[in-house]
Amino acid sequence: MSKIAILTDSSCDIPQELAEKYGIDIMSFHILLDDVDYIERESCTNEEFYEKMRAAKGIPSTAAITPIQFCEKYCQYVDEGYTDVIHVPINRSGSSTYNNAVMAQGMLREERPEHHLRIHLLDPHTYSMPFGWYVCEMARKLQNGAEISHVIQEFETQMDKMEIVLGPYSLKQMKKSGRISAAAAVMGELMGIRPIITLIDGKTKVEAKVRGDDKVVPAMVELAKKRSEGVEDFDYMIGHTNIPQKDDLIKACRKAFGRDPLITFPLGGVVSANTGPDTIALVYVGHAR
């Protein structure tokens, strides 16, 4: 009989109650800010971390989960009699974490040469709840008796459709992470120009620029409507850093899409370390790529 573990990392932004409900293991990233090392989901709440970023002199940096840490986790699964682990780390193109998991599989063969653990390593091609939600869906379906091959195929199909539109209201972190140029960040702050950014298949792109904070939400919603036109299984989620504009986005999306979001969720430390502490995100199901 199969015994299946589901493993992800704290970039998934899965709420703790859902992780506990579905038995999902979440390994935490370390985030360094002003020489203080924070362990995501342990050291402070998301809201506390936003405030620390707003008050900080420097820019946060994140450390990938190491091959040794992954190997130790895999060994734990072997020792506990698991037959399979579905491992969904952060987007491969944005972190060395995925490659570290690949290295850990080689280390496991050395540590437990006769092990029979099947490791299903999946690249979500995205960040945060756009994959975290569907990790929960995999776990739910497995609990209801679905075949592991079926839930993996469904997950990968869904990841080929997920798109994110970001609306950052402060640009310091975006500049540091390279998502916008230093010149664009300076001009944006001086003139109130806000970039509308997509994150699709692990890649970011500035799709538009609007002048004034009040133009951000309408531009985000219009872009999502345009890109998702004709999608039969359309749904959406809203991410935020607990700023007032999240309510404007929820209201605008309800009007535009005629339904409530699947979930409204706070952006975690790893994600907000790159987007900044004043960001809203519209996640939606687009066309298959």
Feature annotation, model-predicted:
Residues 5-71:
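N-terminal glycine-rich anion-binding loop in soluble enzyme alpha/beta folds
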Residues 3, 11-19, 24-25, 30, ...:
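Mixed-charge interfacial surface used for oligomerization/domain docking
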Residues 58-65, 89-96, 125-126:
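Short coil/turn segments at secondary-structure boundaries
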Residues 5-7, 85-87, 267:
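Short glycine-aspartate micro-motif
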Residues 20, 79, 113:
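Anion (oxyanion) recognition and catalysis
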Residues 55, 83-87, 111-122, 264:
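Glycine/charged-rich beta-loop-alpha catalytic/anionic-binding loops adjacent to active sites
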Residues 53-54, 78, 142, 175:
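Hydrophobic residues in alpha-helical segments
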Residues 69-101, 105-108:
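N-terminal glycine-rich phosphate/adenylate-binding segment common to multiple enzyme folds
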